[in-house]
A protein has these predicted regions:
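Class I S-adenosyl-L-methionine
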Residues: 1-109, 208-209, 220
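Short hydrophobic alpha-helical segments that form membrane-spanning helices or hydrophobic packing faces
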Residues: 15-17, 114-116, 171-172
């Protein structure tokens, strides 16, 4: 049996009770590298085999799962945040389906929820925004043409942008092609809920400059919208 488990956004006490229980009983844990708080690995029982998937190919990960299954042992595949968002779990599940290996999913607290908590913010304010768009900029992973940031930005809704801080100049220009203006508020949240969490508040107009000045190059969310302002009904 393979359990896909969301580790949460960073703080180890934000993993779900179910997720923690699965870690405590697993025979094998395959975790998503530095994106997972190492404190969670301390929940593993004595003798648990622990693998860092950041140092493995997909086929190597699957080989470990198959070996554990052959030995009638349980594996926890520990992903950051909630695996349903940018977790790359579909290809693993398809392979397990092909092999006839049973699996299940335990959700986790996504980093976009952790970012809102860090900001003490509500994404959906009356008469401001009742829609949250979760997206990413096109990089190594392509984005469908209809889902380009400039197209989504036309809605002017609350937007949470994952995996794109290294493309911040491109993101800024795309946002300005939509309904956002240079004065639309933005928050960049680095490593939400981790001890080293940082928040940079700026506007769309000075987004790229602010990020470069703060020297944030990875592991950060860009959240955009008037929900960051002070006015609502």
């Amino acid at each position: 049996m393979v359990h896909f488990v969301g580790a949460g956004p960073g703080a180890p006490d934000l993993i779900t009770r179910r997720g923690a229980a699965l870690l405590q009983t697993a025979d094998c844990i395959i975790y998503a590298g530095s994106l997972v708080n190492p404190a969670l690995l301390g929940l593993a029982k004595a003798g648990c085999a622990i693998y860092n998937s950041a140092e493995m190919t997909l086929e190597q990960v699957l080989a470990v799962m198959r070996q554990m299954e052959a030995e009638h042992k349980t594996t926890v595949r520990l992903h950051t945040g909630d695996p349903c968002l940018y977790g790359a779990i579909r290809e693993q599940m398809d392979a397990l389906d092909a092999d006839g290996i049973a699996y299940d999913d335990t959700p986790g607290v996504s980093s976009f929820c952790g970012a809102a908590a860090a900001l003490n913010a509500e994404y959906t304010l009356p008469a401001v925004s009742q829609t949250v768009i979760i997206t990413r900029a096109a990089g190594k992973t392509p984005v469908p043409e209809r889902e380009q940031i400039e197209s989504l930005a036309a809605h002017g809704a609350t937007m949470v942008i994952f995996l794109s801080i290294g493309l911040v100049n491109q993101v800024q220009q795309a946002l300005l092609q939509g309904a956002y203006t240079v004065s639309t508020p933005v928050a960049v949240v680095y490593k939400a809920t981790w001890p080293e969490e940082r928040i940079v508040r700026c506007t769309v107009g000075d987004l790229a400059e602010s990020v470069h000045k703060a020297d944030i190059t990875k592991t950060a969310l860009i959240v955009v919208g008037d929900f960051l302002g002070t006015q609502y009904d």
